Amino acid sequence: MLYAFGIGEIPMSVSGISCNGDGAIGHTIRAVGAVSQALHNAQPGTIVGVRGPFGTDWNLESCVGRDLVIVAGGCGLAPVRPVIVQALAQRSRFGRVMLVAGARTPDHFLFFSEAVQWAQNPQLEVELTADSAGPDWPWRVGVVTEPLRRLTLDPPQTSALICGPEVMMRFSAQTLLEKGLMPKHIRLSLERNMQCGVGWCGHCQLGPLLLCRDGPVVGYDVAEPLLLVPEL
């Protein structure tokens, strides 16, 4: 939870973790409201409040020894970026590592230069796609489920991490189920109106879950029946 003094507090995923031991963390913030605008406009030296981290993480340890598929849509690339960096740093602990990342247009791609570097790294299999793009766009055009559907996977040995708009996550998870992955090996990062961060206020309730405590990362075996309930 990030707090802009005198304005308010918002939940925010970590998009970068320092590797030099200084404890620094990074956040990727899109200015869409009063708090995010204040944080977006903050200058070096500005003091901000930080609480957490709260809830569940991607549990990358459970993927050790397995193939790993990371699916990111839009701003969803930011929360999975530390996973990609960690998987590369510990590359020998995993089988294949695959990234499918998409955005509405090339201009909406987060960390695009870094994504291009990942695509050029022989230790990663990367598919980049934009929903719409001009003739100069060298990657795929279309939604993320299209390159995801073309992947050849070993379902019993594959884990998947998905982050992005909820509709994109549902369709991506369904694509992976059709390819034979088990729901418990597919994890999503869910969003609701998180406020307290410790499971007290109930604003982030999704059925029996309080996402600040039981999420935001949830197995699809748990999430699927909840996401099928209208207006939940």
Question: Which residue ranges define each predicted feature?
Answer:
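Non-heme iron-sulfur electron-transfer modules
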Residues: G207-L232
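FNR/FR-type flavoprotein reductase catalytic core
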Residues: A34-Q195
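A generic structural signal for residues embedded in beta-strands
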Residues: L2-A4, V50, L206
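A generic fold-level signal
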Residues: E9, N20-D22, C63, C196, ...
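Ferredoxin-reductase
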Residues: M1-T46, A103-T105
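Sterically constrained small-residue positions within well-ordered secondary structures
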Residues: Y3-F5, S18, Q90, Q117, ...
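Preference for bulky hydrophobic residues occupying beta-strand positions
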Residues: H27-I29, V126, L188, C204
